[in-house]
């Protein structure tokens, strides 16, 4: 049995600080290849997710890793000891990148040939897994697996002319199959994930399966509590499915440093391991790596790598029903407030520092409502924008919990263990002064502001959260938030950008 990685380094651009080795503030090109090597060698991460989306993606990453760092990779075999996993564009959703999907799939046999030359025959398959984002059905991942088998691996048998086959020209094509990891990002698909996995299992018959649960995008689209509870439902469903099919399933969770995006940081990783029992692999995003002291980062990654995997908490049907009800109530409260803040979020997001050369993923937000569709930035910029205007997104929608009875509240607390801790971490950055300023700048309605204040009051009076600056860092952040809003109001944008950067350094994450 292969090693299942415990940590996966990603290219999420959530870092406030720029790493010393980067040639510029924007990590791109050869720097991303170097970053992959350093993730393995300096940080001790088991796996690197290589984002194959956007026009400047480098499909020659394996060639560059093996040729630039031969001594390291002779000792640490790519595909056996360490792993490189492609994140594909979803051709059903990201129409402009359909051919990038094809190009990336076609590059997998090239990596195989390179490894044959570097390691010797039959030693390793360096890239054998791909991640499909925004998966909503088993058909999508079945199609990806079959596309590779039929359109890539079997093309060596095509006859070109008069008995001459493709393999006579370019050699035989390996590997013959790849493993597909569904990345599930929307609430309904997370809560019904067993249908996606079981459908794939019945057709493809894999020996095991890795399943990637998003934690960040669902929070942006439906609210933090909905995201947490949807992941808990998914983990329970996957565990039950694994038992019933007698088939190993290894969940991955995509988590960032701030509470809204998962709260996995070098200072909070133990609580995240406790929260998400049943998860095998945790994403190590850029803020985790670059916004904390190196020794603390390396120690935290080592601890995650060596931590014991606890079984997922299995939900009874009545518990699952309660959690589903909470996610609906929470989302109904959260979404209209976010719609009303959309202009503010979009205006602030374009001023945040850029840390990657390309858009990483397209946005999911844009559910249909009577007012039409709301366009929002990616989750990192979304979170950074709300923190910067002094309204941490973790607080939005919280008062919907007032609808729960005592039994429902107990079930909620049992299934979101670190709820109060996450909320308290975020609430330190609440800026009371921002309400008047955002009303002046973006004409935010009294009704929206009243709803946010109701949520804040509930967090303070019912949950017992201390709001606003409670230490030097949070007080400084609140002051910077007011200065940012004042400079933005006066259109002094260079100063606005400076305050945004200073706040990100205090949070140790852009968003």
UniProtKB/Swiss-Prot annotation:
Regulation: Allosterically inhibited by L-aspartate and L-malate. PEPC activity is not affected by allosteric activators of E.coli PEPC such as glucose 6-phosphate, fructose 1,6-bisphosphate, and acetyl coenzyme A.
Annotated coiled-coil segments of the chain: none
Note accompanying the cofactor annotation: Mg(2+) cannot be replaced by Mn(2+).
MF terms in GO: magnesium ion binding; phosphoenolpyruvate carboxylase activity
Matches recorded under Pfam families: PEPcase_2
pH dependence: Optimum pH is 8.0.
Thermal response of activity: Optimum temperature is 85 degrees Celsius.
Cofactor list: Mg(2+)
The reaction(s) this protein catalyses: oxaloacetate + phosphate = phosphoenolpyruvate + hydrogencarbonate
EC number from the UniProt entry: 4.1.1.31
An example Gene Ontology biological process: tricarboxylic acid cycle
SUPFAM superfamilies recorded: Phosphoenolpyruvate/pyruvate domain
Family: Belongs to the PEPCase type 2 family.
Subunit structure, interactors included: Homotetramer.
HAMAP family xref list: PEPcase_type2 (MF_01904)
Function field: Catalyzes the irreversible beta-carboxylation of phosphoenolpyruvate (PEP) to form oxaloacetate (OAA), a four-carbon dicarboxylic acid source for the tricarboxylic acid cycle.
Protein name: Phosphoenolpyruvate carboxylase
């Amino acid at each position: 049995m292969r090693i299942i990685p415990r940590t996966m380094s990603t290219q999420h651009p959530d870092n406030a600080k720029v790493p010393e080795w980067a040639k510029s503030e924007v990590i791109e090109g050869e720097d991303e290849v170097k970053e992959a090597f350093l993730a393995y060698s300096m940080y001790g991460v088991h796996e690197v997710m290589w984002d194959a989306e956007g026009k400047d993606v480098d499909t020659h990453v394996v060639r560059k890793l093996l040729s630039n760092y031969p001594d390291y990779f002779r000792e640490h075999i790519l595909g056996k000891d360490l792993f490189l996993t492609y994140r594909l564009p979803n051709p059903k959703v990201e129409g402009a990148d359909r051919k990038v999907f094809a190009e990336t799939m076609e590059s997998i046999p090239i990596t195989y040939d390179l490894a044959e030359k570097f390691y010797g025959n039959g030693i390793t398959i360096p890239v054998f897994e791909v991640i499909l984002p925004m998966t909503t059905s088993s058909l999508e991942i079945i199609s990806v697996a079959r596309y590779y088998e039929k359109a890539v691996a079997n093309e060596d048998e095509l006859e070109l002319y008069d008995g001459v086959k493709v393999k006579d020209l370019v050699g035989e094509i390996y590997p013959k199959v790849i493993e597909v990891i569904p990345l599930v990002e929307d609430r309904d698909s997370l809560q019904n994930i067993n249908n996606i996995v079981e459908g794939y299992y019945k057709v493809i018959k894999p020996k095991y399966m890795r399943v990637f649960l998003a934690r960040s995008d669902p929070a942006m689209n439906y609210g933090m509590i909905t995201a947490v509870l949807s992941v808990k439902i998914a983990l329970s469903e996957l565990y039950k499915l694994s038992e019933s099919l007698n088939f190993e399933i290894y969940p991955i969770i995509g988590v960032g440093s701030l509470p809204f995006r998962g709260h996995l940081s070098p200072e909070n990783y133990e609580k995240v391991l406790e929260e998400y029992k049943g998860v095998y692999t945790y994403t190590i995003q850029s803020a985790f790596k670059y916004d904390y002291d190196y020794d603390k980062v390396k120690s935290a990654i080592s601890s995650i790598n060596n931590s014991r995997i606890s079984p997922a908490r299995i939900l009874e049907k009545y518990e699952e029903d309660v959690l589903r009800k909470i996610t609906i109530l929470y989302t109904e409260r959260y979404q209209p407030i976010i719609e009303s803040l959309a202009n503010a979020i979009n205006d602030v997001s374009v001023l945040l520092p850029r840390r990657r050369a390309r858009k990483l993923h397209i946005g999911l937000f844009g559910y249909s409502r009577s007012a039409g569709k709301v366009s929002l930035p990616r989750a990192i910029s979304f979170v950074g924008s709300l923190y910067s205007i002094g309204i941490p997104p973790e607080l939005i929608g919280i008062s919907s919990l007032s609808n729960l009875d005592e039994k429902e509240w107990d079930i909620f607390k049992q299934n979101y263990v670190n709820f109060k801790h996450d909320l308290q971490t975020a609430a330190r950055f609440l800026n009371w002064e921002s309400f008047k300023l955002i009303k002046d700048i973006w004409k935010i309605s009294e009704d929206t502001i009243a709803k946010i204040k109701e949520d804040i009051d509930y967090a303070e009076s019912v949950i017992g959260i201390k709001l606003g600056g409670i230490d030097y860092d949070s007080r400084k952040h609140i002051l910077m938030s007011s200065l940012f809003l004042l400079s933005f109001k006066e259109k002094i944008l260079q100063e606005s950008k400076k305050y945004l950067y200073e706040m990100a350094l205090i949070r140790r994450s852009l968003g």
